């Protein structure tokens, strides 16, 4: 497809989405010159604004002013994306294959894709909570539309190491230690031994092993570990912080290593404590230090009802009032946010630790619009809407009198994804300032997490950082989305390497290195997080324990995990690696020259794959696309464990979908596969996905009526229209198909 045609098609996908469907039946109320869905207006006007002391008329008028003032600039930024993409397409068509490095870089600078690096300077962020600034630890990402998931994640600040080990393949199912319906004491002993080995590694005793300890108690204001008739102390005397219970017989002992807390829980009457000579029933680890409540890639929020549900959950998390009725077996209980944890400090005073994860909220990017609010019959940009509403809903989370407040520093943390270069980051900075003024919040109350997941941001990362130097809270690599943009940006250059080979392509490691180097050089350590991406294989925790520690050794002080259990296991890595020391070493070594490698386009050196290899790539990606899309479109599930073609559960969201659809669109564009082969694979894989979902009573089969399956048609569009979709994003097609399905089935 010629470059200008791709650009026009991209605009058409977006503009069609902005104009409200004539069949729209949403009940609306006019406020602030906007037509707002009544369900959203009522929630904000009746539930939120009175609680936060904001006048409703002033709020809605100011809301409308921000939308009208900032919409033209938002449109300009999207038009600039299309303009640059058209120029890139033309360049690749004239220079197919891997570009000449010097000429390519010069071209990118000429068209403004690459900008000059800003002068040496560091970020100036203030009032950052310690969980972000000075604590290294795991980060969860959870869909905000699911209250149970949100509560589980918020409460995942503390997690049972014993449960995490026993319930996963972190302890191999072998040698009599297999998992089963009943408790396996052989497995239990392996868990206990793992825990003792861990304590010896990260909190060693001076002259003894934790495995030999017969009793723990407190003497002379210190932890006493009794072995035979001797008393042994921790090598690090400062590691002991406090206890609960009595000096002689504590019920818990609080320790600290690398800034993270460890709680030894003691109960000789407990089934596990009975088997342990010290009465130790569990080792509780500080786990998910921070959590991102997600309105973006892990949710399917396509209309006012969906958005209002998410906003309500976010509001109640900030008030501390979110609850959920949970059924387990024949009993039902109410899940709520955990209280803070209270100990007796080693000085005898009360010591209180935060009981919940520190929460970020991820807004959507600059591309999408949403029918929850209209202006002159057109949907407003969802990113502007998110910025205003997630902020006003977060105000209770900074209220000093709130016992379950989120931030003790008075900051609201917003992750902004899918930004292309410093101009777009500057737009976010301006938007946040407008929101602060609307809500009478001090300047830079809103902190921003900048996702480094688009190519134009990666190659201009320093400039992006400095555009938000007064409000930056993190930078984070998102390899999955970043790969999707890598493919789409250079779609016309030629056929790309296979999806799995992207992991070892030169640009990938250079991209990861550059993120850390830029963060360190711009002064993030001690002020903001430098993060890395998700471990997607939810059931392979043993493999995660072995491999994910590598992200810390590369300089990340946080990395994403798919579950509270994953957070607890990943937390052990931060005890074994002092990340801030690693960052000091990287700073001393000097910044690596990464730009040339980042610009290395992953065009395949040759395309002589065998028919079997092509079929494997087709089937793997088609199965992945269908397995995710069918739940997104027909069940409104934006993030879930999706079995791959080998029945291995993978945590899938829109980022993984973007890669799978873009690689096939690329191969189709360059004749590696044909449209007929794509359709044939989709139809075969639909049968596989149907079988994988056979146990779900709410599931609708895609086969054999493929033309009637909305999900199948969505998957087909994602591939066949993949070159047209702006930046390879899947949202325009997914949103349209989800709304179609809801309309067909009368779902609100």
Swiss-Prot record:
Mg(2+) binds at residues 453, 481. GO terms for molecular function: magnesium ion binding; malate synthase activity. The modification Cysteine sulfenic acid (-SOH) is found at residue 639. It is an enzyme of class 2 (transferase). Its EC number is 2.3.3.9. The active site is at 362 (proton acceptor), 653 (proton donor). Acetyl-CoA binds at residues 141, 148-149, 298, 335, 562. It catalyses: glyoxylate + acetyl-CoA + H2O = (S)-malate + CoA + H(+). Its cofactor is Mg(2+). It is found in: Cytoplasm. Monomer. This is Malate synthase G.
């Amino acid at each position: 497809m010629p470059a200008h045609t791709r650009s026009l098609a991209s605009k058409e996908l977006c503009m069609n989405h902005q104009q409200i469907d004539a069949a729209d039946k949403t009940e609306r109320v006019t406020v602030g010159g906007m037509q707002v869905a009544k369900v959203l207006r009522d929630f904000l006007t009746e539930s939120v604004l009175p609680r936060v002391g904001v006048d409703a008329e002033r709020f809605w008028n100011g809301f409308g002013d921000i939308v009208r003032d900032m919409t033209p600039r938002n449109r300009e930024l999207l038009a600039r994306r299309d303009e640059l993409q058209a120029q890139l397409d033309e360049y690749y068509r004239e220079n197919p294959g891997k570009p000449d490095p010097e000429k390519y870089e010069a071209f990118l600078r000429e068209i403004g894709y690459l900008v000059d690096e800003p002068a040496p300077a560091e970020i100036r962020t203030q009032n950052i909570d310690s969980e972000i600034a000075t604590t290294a630890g795991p980060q969860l990402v959870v869909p905000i539309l699911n209250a149970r998931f949100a509560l589980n994640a918020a409460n995942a600040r503390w997690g049972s190491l014993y449960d995490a080990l026993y319930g996963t393949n972190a302890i191999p199912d072998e040698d009599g230690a297999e998992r089963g319906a009943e408790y396996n004491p052989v497995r239990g002993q392996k868990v206990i031994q793992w825990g003792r080995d861990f304590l010896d590694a990260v909190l060693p005793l001076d002259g003894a092993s934790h495995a030999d300890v017969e009793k723990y108690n407190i003497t002379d204001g210190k932890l006493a570990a009794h072995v035979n008739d001797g008393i042994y102390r921790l090598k690090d005397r400062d590691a002991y912080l406090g206890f609960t219970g009595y000096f002689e017989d504590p019920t818990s002992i609080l320790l600290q290593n690398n800034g993270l807390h460890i709680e030894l829980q003691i109960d000789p009457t407990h089934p596990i404590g009975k088997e342990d000579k010290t009465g130790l029933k569990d080792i509780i680890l500080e786990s998910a230090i921070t959590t991102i409540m997600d309105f973006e890639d892990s949710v399917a929020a396509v209309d006012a009802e969906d958005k209002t549900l998410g906003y309500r959950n976010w509001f109640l998390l900030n008030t501390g009032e979110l609850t959920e009725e949970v059924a387990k077996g024949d009993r039902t209980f109410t899940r709520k946010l955990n209280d803070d944890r209270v100990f007796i400090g080693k000085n005898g005073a009360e010591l209180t630790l935060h009981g919940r994860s520190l929460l970020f909220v991820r807004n959507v990017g600059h591309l999408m619009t949403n029918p929850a609010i209209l202006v002159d019959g057109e949907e407003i940009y969802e990113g502007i809407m998110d910025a205003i509403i997630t902020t006003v809903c977060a105000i209770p989370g900074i209220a000093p009198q709130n016992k379950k407040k989120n931030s003790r520093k008075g900051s609201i943390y917003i992750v902004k994804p899918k930004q292309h270069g410093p101009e777009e980051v500057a737009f976010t900075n301006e938007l946040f300032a407008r929101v602060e003024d609307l809500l009478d919040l001090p300047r830079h109350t809103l902190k921003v997490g900048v996702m480094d997941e688009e190519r134009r941001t990666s190659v201009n990362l320093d400039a992006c950082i400095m555009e938000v130097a007064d409000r930056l809270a993190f930078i984070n690599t998102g390899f999955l989305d970043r790969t999707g943009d890598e493919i789409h940006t250079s779609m016309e250059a030629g056929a790309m390497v296979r999806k799995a080979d992207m992991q070892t392509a030169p640009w990938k490691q250079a991209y990861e290195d550059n993120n850390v180097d830029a963060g360190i050089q711009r002064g993030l350590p001690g002020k903001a997080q430098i993060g890395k991406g998700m471990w997607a294989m939810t059931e392979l925790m043993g493999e995660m324990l072995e491999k994910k520690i590598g992200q810390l050794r590369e300089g990340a002080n946080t990395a994403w995990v798919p579950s509270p259990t994953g957070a607890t296991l990943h937390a052990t890595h931060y005890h074994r690696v002092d990340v801030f020391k690693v960052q000091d070493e990287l700073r001393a070594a000097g910044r690596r020259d990464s730009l040339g490698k980042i610009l290395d386009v992953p065009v395949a050196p040759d395309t002589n794959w065998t028919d079997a290899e092509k079929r494997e790539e087709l089937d793997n990606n088609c199965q992945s696309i269908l397995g995710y899309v069918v739940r997104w479109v027909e069940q409104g599930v934006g993030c879930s464990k999706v079995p791959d073609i080998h029945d291995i559960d993978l945590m899938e969201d829109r980022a993984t979908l973007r890669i799978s659809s873009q690689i096939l669109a690329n191969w189709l564009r360059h004749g590696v596969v044909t449209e007929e082969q794509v359709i044939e694979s989709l139809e075969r894989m639909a049968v596989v996905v149907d079988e994988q979902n056979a146990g779900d009573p709410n599931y609708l089969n895609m086969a054999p009526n493929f033309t009637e399956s909305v999900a199948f048609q969505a998957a087909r569009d994602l591939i066949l229209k993949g070159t047209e979709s702006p930046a390879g994003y899947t949202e325009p097609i997914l949103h349209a198909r989800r709304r179609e399905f809801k309309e067909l089935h009368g779902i609100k």
